[in-house]
Amino acid sequence: MLGCTCCEHVTRLLLIAILMPLWATFPAQGQGGPQVTSPTKPPPNPYHYRKTIYPWHRDITATIFWIGEKPGGRNKTSNHHSSWDGKWAVNYGGYDDPNPEARANFAPKSFRPQLNSFYVALPYNDCLNHRLHRPEASRVIPWFSRYNPKPGRSVCKGRWIQLYYQRKVCYAQWEDCGPWVTDDWKYVFGGHPPRSRQAGIDVSPAVRDYLGLKSGDKLHWRFVEFGGVPRGPWSWYGSNNPFVNPEADPDVAVIRQLRQYLEQKKLEEFRRKQSPTPR
């Protein structure tokens, strides 16, 4: 019995020695040593959303746009910058030349894109002046609460879109806002038709070339979780692309938060068991 008690005592000391550095990362309170504190509510589990199915937006008129496009004709806005990136063309690496003769492998021949060449614009911006979110954003964006973003930080930028045109399926990332309006949440997240009758989605030259469509054609599109995106040409390029840079997936940060929460709960349970029981 004495030997067994000694072994238990040694095991307890070893566990305390291993976990003490972890306790030191939490704030101390009074004379009682470090206190482990946890959020009152666990962070959402991203794995629960991996198979989320979003509704289709059908027969939506698409137009072609590209990074570096100058204002002209109906287009009154320069595409050297996007609604979320003031240096869009610079960060992309140059001009996303739409001329088919100047393109190969769904990208310009003159340089390798530093961002995903498969991108789209939808007529909604969840942020106002990069400082705060639109009043309805937290209510209408299905994944908003998953990320609990800081004011002015977009939860729409980089989201994946599935597109369908004449029996071909393509995937792209949402990287700009438009065409024509940037507040049409009833269409983007609801069942309403686009407020603009001219177009409801802009697609990049890479999307155009993969699907074989031209400006003015109608397609179907819907949101899709990154876990449901297969590999393809849309997985080849870009630091904003989770296929290339896993840290670009916003769920990575949420998974970290969830793991930290679970670790804290385990530490709390361990400390509770180690505390002497009052007699």
Language-model-detected regions and their locations in the chain:
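N-terminal secretory signal peptides that target proteins for export/translocation
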Residues: M1-V10
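Bacterial N-terminal signal peptides
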Residues: L13-A24
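Secreted/periplasmic proteins
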Residues: G30-P278
